[in-house]
Amino acid sequence: MAYYRTPHDVTALPAWQALNQHRQAMQDFSMREAFNADPQRFSQFTLSSCGLFLDYSKNLITSETRDLLVGLAKEVGLKDAINSLYAGEPVNSSEGRPALHTALRRPVGDKLSVNGVNIMPDVHKVLNQITDLVGRIHDGLWRGYTEKPITDVVNIGIGGSFLGPELVSEALLSYAHKGVRCHYLANIDGSEFHELTMKLRAETTLFIVSSKSFNTLETLKNAQAARAWYLAQGGSEAELYRHFIAVSSNNAAAVAFGIREENIFPMWDWVGGRYSLWSAIGLPIALAIGMSNFKELLSGAYTMDQHFQNAPFEANMPVLLGLLGVWYGNFWGAQSHAILPYDHYLRNITKHLQQLDMESNGKSVRQDGTPVATDTGPVIWGGVGCNGQHAYHQLLHQGTQLIPADFIVPIVSFNPVSDHHQWLYANCLSQSQALMLGKTRVEAEAELRDKGIPEDEVQKLAPHKVIPGNRPSNTLVVERISPRRLGALVAMYEHKVFVQSVIWGINAFDQWGVELGKELGKGVYNRLTGAEETSAEDASTQGLINYFRGRHRG
């Protein structure tokens, strides 16, 4: 039976029991000692593929650990699950849908059937539609109501319609097409709308309304505000079509808004929002970096898709990263995972991976609705590396929690300044090294004595300078951030998340927890505005409503 129909109790599997026993044997394992004892440790636990180099040698693992984790992947049927994902089977069981973000990266000529229909012609038809629009805007042929060419594009969307595209367009800023600036409007907070429109001219601005339903509250409210702003700036209803296009599956609602049917880019129910940057949701990416670079992004993701599907688990980046996450979350008690990019342009990757990982694997029931038998997705957090060193890295080094980390760093900078990049790279490596090595009491005391500090002060200060070490991390190195390598990097994390969902027996492609807040939000809004007079379901919410109503002005 398919894994999504009959999820297992992973804790009852022999491979899980073997890992439990191995974890006890690893209680006193020291990475420092392991490196000293084995000069080949680095080469044994590194991997290169798809333009990415992965060093996972600074982990609480031996070759036996890797073998046992791979054994777990095999025992849960990961290979069959990967094949089910790629074949378009309904792996999103709660909604009865496939999850075919990988299809968006497949080359023209491939065939893939969903409900008996080959979807690949439609995928490439939309890609051609994107190509046409991007060409017209970049060539200055798409003009606003005063016949001036478009200079600014605003993507109105939230969640997956925002985080992925923003990550990619900013990560690839060095590839940006000159003459067109891309902006993102996600938050319903009016301050964000105000600050953005202060920088724009309506006559040269194009808005992309990205919403599958064309009914997402935040997106629709911002689209309505943008429309009102456009009209107030001198635009007309008759010329609205020049300034608004949509990415949606609800054509009727988009047309009613004033968008022409030929300017609506379709979405499919077999692509989830957090996996959708490869689709027409990626239109702002293509406008930002050009169509050839957008296709390189897709190509890089496709190479990772092939690697994930075909590489043996022992040499498979997404599989290994997923298994390491299971190792720490389920056997070492880790509750969170840090993403630490040492690259200014990758500063938003943590936000995208938060949604990708936490919305996918933040589940407490298995595919069949029964409770999970173990912890599932971790909290994902982090930020730009050097900045973090002067903020929260202290917790990583001397805190009481075990927090695995991924360091991501390029070898070459697009903007070299003196020896800055050498220092950036050195900082990245030294942080992972410090997490692994730590500092012993003996080393701390010797360091203080070398500074001529009196012995009584040495004994007082030494405990504060001890750093436990033995803290795990992965280091991902790319030669330089490019569309192809970035595509591979993002796809790698997508597949890592899927690996973990299969092991835990959960559905990585629904998000019912998000819906409850939306439903309750309508009732709260109605009570805030006086449209609903009945009390809220609880005294706390009602008290906060009353507090707002008694003080709100404007």
UniProtKB/Swiss-Prot annotation:
Origin species:
Pseudomonas fluorescens (strain SBW25)
Task: Quote the cellular component terms of the Gene Ontology held in the record.
Answer: cytosol
* Family stated for the protein in its record: Belongs to the GPI family.
What protein name does the entry list? Glucose-6-phosphate isomerase
Key words of the record: Cytoplasm, Gluconeogenesis, Glycolysis, Isomerase
GO molecular function ontology, one term from the record: monosaccharide binding
Q: What is its main location?
A: cytoplasm
Q: Which reaction does it catalyse?
A: alpha-D-glucose 6-phosphate = beta-D-fructose 6-phosphate
Q: Which NCBIfam families does the entry link to? A: PRK00179.1
Which residues are annotated as active site? 359 (proton donor), 390, 518
Q: Which PROSITE patterns match?
A: P_GLUCOSE_ISOMERASE_1, P_GLUCOSE_ISOMERASE_2, P_GLUCOSE_ISOMERASE_3
What's the encoding gene here? pgi
Q: Where in the cell is it found?
A: Cytoplasm
Q: What does this protein do?
A: Catalyzes the reversible isomerization of glucose-6-phosphate to fructose-6-phosphate.
> Biological process (GO) annotations?
gluconeogenesis; glucose 6-phosphate metabolic process; glycolytic process
Biological classification of the source: Bacteria, Pseudomonadati, Pseudomonadota, Gammaproteobacteria, Pseudomonadales
Keyword Isomerase included in the entry's annotation: yes
Task: Please name the top-level EC class of this enzyme.
Answer: isomerase
Query: Quick one: which pathway?
Result: Carbohydrate biosynthesis; gluconeogenesis; Carbohydrate degradation; glycolysis; D-glyceraldehyde 3-phosphate and glycerone phosphate from D-glucose: step 2/4
Q: EC number(s) in its UniProt entry?
A: 5.3.1.9
